[in-house]
């Protein structure tokens, strides 16, 4: 099975394709002043990133396939996502973490375990 080059975010009847490109990540890191992996660092007692930061990451990822969407559009899409009964934690666990994994910025669990095993040898 071939891996899709993007993550999907289903909101209402719309399916948004998400992909963090190197260019998008560089812009995000410049604007946020922090490494993108640090945003999702779960070693600090699992802090939930600020909503605005999470939406900036979404905006950076959504514009690869949905050209012309503005940050306000992403906020409106997130409002619809909330209206469907989701919450900010759902966005993190069901959308952003898979996005970071599929885009190659954090390892999937099985790859992470392999890397740790190699490092311990």
PLM features: what roles do these ranges have?
Residues 21:
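Residue-level signal for threonine
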Residues 25-28:
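A short local loop/turn or secondary-structure capping micro-motif enriched for an aromatic residue
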């Amino acid at each position: 099975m071939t891996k899709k080059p993007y993550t999907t975010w289903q909101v209402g009847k719309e399916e948004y394709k998400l992909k963090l490109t190197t260019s998008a990540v560089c812009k995000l890191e410049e604007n946020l002043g922090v490494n993108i992996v640090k945003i999702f660092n779960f070693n600090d007692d699992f802090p939930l990133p600020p909503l605005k930061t999470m939406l900036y990451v979404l905006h950076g990822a959504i514009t690869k396939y949905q050209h012309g969407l503005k940050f306000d559009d992403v906020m409106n899409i997130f409002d619809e996502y909330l209206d469907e009964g989701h919450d900010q934690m759902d966005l993190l666990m069901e959308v952003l973490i898979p996005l970071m994994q599929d885009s190659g910025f954090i390892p999937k669990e099985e790859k992470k375990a392999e890397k740790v095993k190699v490092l311990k040898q």
